[in-house]
């Protein structure tokens, strides 16, 4: 039995074609584009606080934030709902068919669960909470400090970026298969190295941004600025 055939047995067959293609399309356009752009913007952390704040938290147009919600959050909600439905119908068969494609499919489902929790935490902690509670975007110093001195934060973000990079890179291959762009085993094998390259590039961008934040969090300037922020919020700090 081929790898493709064995993998197909693990994929739920009850999802309507239109719904399946729409779900995969919204995952790639615009979500994947936004993820790449978001990772790129966060690399501005290498250039300091002002560059990062401008790149990540400031919008050039007053309606840009609303457009971001429509273009990104709504497709994300749809893709999440679509993925949860597929997840409940997922029945792994890796013991019966321990092929490479089946292992990738299983890891994709596991990564999806991890990414779901990671995005929920990230959206709340880095976007919603500071705006709803403190009335503005989370300052660079606060985020960089957490990356440096709060081990659970850097651990969650390290694993979250890993899962996101894999889920997106492998998802692009699934998208190409679902839309008929990769119609043969040969074409899938030829695309496999590109999928790995995409994964490594995304992972490098994400972990690079985390490293820049981690490094900045150890500077005296960031620690002093973070102390001022916490003092303004009425929170006592250890540093």
Report the location of each language-model feature.
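Membrane-embedded alpha-helical bundles that constitute the cytochrome b-like, heme-associated redox core
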Residues: 1-239
């Amino acid at each position: 039995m081929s790898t493709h055939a064995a993998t197909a047995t693990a994929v739920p067959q009850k999802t309507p074609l239109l719904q399946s293609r729409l779900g995969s399309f919204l995952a790639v356009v615009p979500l994947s584009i936004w993820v790449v752009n978001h990772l790129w913007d966060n690399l501005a952390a290498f250039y300091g606080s002002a560059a990062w704040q401008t790149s990540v938290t400031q919008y050039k147009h007053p309606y840009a934030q609303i457009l971001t919600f429509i273009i990104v959050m709504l497709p994300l909600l749809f893709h999440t709902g679509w993925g949860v439905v597929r997840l409940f119908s997922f029945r792994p068969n890796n013991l019966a068919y321990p092929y490479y494609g089946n292992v990738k499919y299983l890891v994709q489902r596991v990564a999806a669960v991890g990414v779901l929790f990671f995005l929920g935490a990230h959206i709340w902690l880095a976007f919603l909470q500071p705006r709803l509670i403190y009335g503005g975007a989370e300052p660079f110093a606060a985020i960089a400090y957490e990356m440096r001195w709060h081990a659970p934060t850097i651990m969650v973000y390290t694993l979250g970026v890993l899962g996101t990079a894999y889920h997106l890179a492998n998802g692009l291959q699934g998208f190409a298969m679902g839309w008929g762009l990769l119609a043969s085993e040969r074409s899938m094998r030829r695309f496999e190295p590109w999928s790995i390259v995409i994964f490594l590039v995304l992972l490098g961008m994400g972990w690079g941004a985390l490293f820049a934040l981690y490094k900045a969090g150890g500077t005296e300037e960031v620690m002093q600025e973070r102390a001022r922020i916490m003092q303004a919020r009425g929170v006592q700090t250890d540093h």
